[in-house]
Amino acid sequence: MAERSLSGLTEEEAVAVHAQFQTTFSAFIVLAAVAHVLVWVWKPWF
């Protein structure tokens, strides 16, 4: 029987989950930055 990590994922599954997380997190950061810039252009807070 193959050994599994504490998360229950194999090494390959963990790498795939991490890659997907990086992609979605990067998209979130870009979207948040764009939203902040648009709000700042509309109504500067300093």
UniProtKB/Swiss-Prot annotation:
Keywords of this entry: Antenna complex, Bacteriochlorophyll, Cell inner membrane, Cell membrane, Chlorophyll, Chromophore, Light-harvesting polypeptide, Magnesium, Membrane, Metal-binding, Transmembrane, Transmembrane helix
Transmembrane segments: 26-46
A GO BP annotation: photosynthesis, light reaction
Cellular-component GO terms for this entry: plasma membrane; plasma membrane light-harvesting complex
Positions bound to a bacteriochlorophyll: H18, H36
Cellular compartments annotated: Cell inner membrane
Family: Belongs to the antenna complex beta subunit family.
Protein name stated in the entry: Light-harvesting protein B-800/850 beta 2 chain
Organism: Magnetospirillum molischianum
Gene: B2
